[in-house]
Amino acid sequence: MKIAIVGGPTAVGKTDIMIEVCEEIGAEIISMDSRQIYRYMDIGTAKPTPEQRKRVPHHMIDILDPDEYYNAFLYRKDSLKAVEAILKRGKIPVYVGGTGLYADALVRGIFEGVPADENIRKELRELERREPGILRKMLEEFDPEAATRIHPNDLKRTIRALEVYMKTGRRISELQKETKGDDRFFIIVLTRERYDLYDRINRRVDRMIEMGLVDEVKRLLSMGYSKDLNSMKTIGYKEVIEYLEGKYDFEKMVHLIKRNTRHFARRQIIWFKRYENAIWYNLTFVSKEELKKTLKELIVKNFSV
């Protein structure tokens, strides 16, 4: 039995096509999106609509409040429980989403062997406060491979990698390779030509604004959720907050959301290219009906192995 992970960049069209595919093969969708797990954050995370969720059952959506902690280790554990429940119902589980870290957790396993050390973390945070950018330089020196995988702005993962090195004297990239992978999964990646994808991103952002993204952010702030929460730093929410603070005007806000989303999509594509055995489909050149037929056959065939 092989379970499909259908990944790809934001706005490529994963949700729409996979709802139709899963509806026709009797499958249930497990969201692989690190932002759709949060309640009240609907428009800016492009959650499936209530109508879509009625057509095909979805899992790992709306499971946490925006101020609750979550990570890839917990995602793997919780989503595999969903897999078990789906299998007991005689249905096919299919992962759909663009969070590469969650895909890694499933396919390559999670390295959790070194306990957290708050003293080291505090020391590293203080070092970064005194000299911004120093932790990135340290990571590039001590673990160049990890530095290529961790975004320069991802302070949390940078600190974790340095913490592991300081505690063990070993690189986290080496320890992660020793983590046992999981061969129950195979990866399908949906992509588009850049001009096509960027146009879809721009139009999606316009729709989010029309649907009330600004009001959604205002409501979250009025509920007491801090702008400093990890969830509130999501693209779309962060820019709206800064607009509400008067840092720039409405047009600049929209421009920044579009630009930052395009950059994010590019990083997602780079991430999924790391999976050597992934099966890629370019939606710019393949018809929807042809792709649906191919995906249905591929998912069912591998599930039946």
From Swiss-Prot:
**What's the Enzyme Commission number for this chain?**
2.5.1.75
The cofactor named in the record is: Mg(2+)
Provide the alphabetized UniProt keywords. ATP-binding, Magnesium, Nucleotide-binding, Transferase, tRNA processing
- What is the uppermost EC class here? transferase
User: Region Interaction with substrate tRNA: what ranges?
Assistant: 33-36
In the record, biological process GO terms are: tRNA modification
**Which SUPFAM superfamilies does the annotation name?**
P-loop containing nucleoside triphosphate hydrolases
Q: Which reaction does it catalyse?
A: adenosine(37) in tRNA + dimethylallyl diphosphate = N(6)-dimethylallyladenosine(37) in tRNA + diphosphate
Q: Where is this site: Interaction with substrate tRNA?
A: T99, R121
- Binding-site residues for ATP, renumbered to this chain: G8, P9, T10, A11, V12, G13, K14, T15
InterPro entries reported for this sequence:
Dimethylallyltransferase, IPT, P-loop_NTPase
Where does the chain bind substrate? T10, A11, V12, G13, K14, T15
Single GO term (MF): tRNA dimethylallyltransferase activity
Give the family this protein belongs to, as stated in its UniProt record: Belongs to the IPP transferase family.
Role summary: Catalyzes the transfer of a dimethylallyl group onto the adenine at position 37 in tRNAs that read codons beginning with uridine, leading to the formation of N6-(dimethylallyl)adenosine (i(6)A).
Subunit record text: Monomer.
Descriptive protein name: tRNA dimethylallyltransferase
Q: What is the originating organism of this protein?
A: Thermotoga sp. (strain RQ2)
Taxonomic classification, please?
Bacteria, Thermotogati, Thermotogota, Thermotogae, Thermotogales
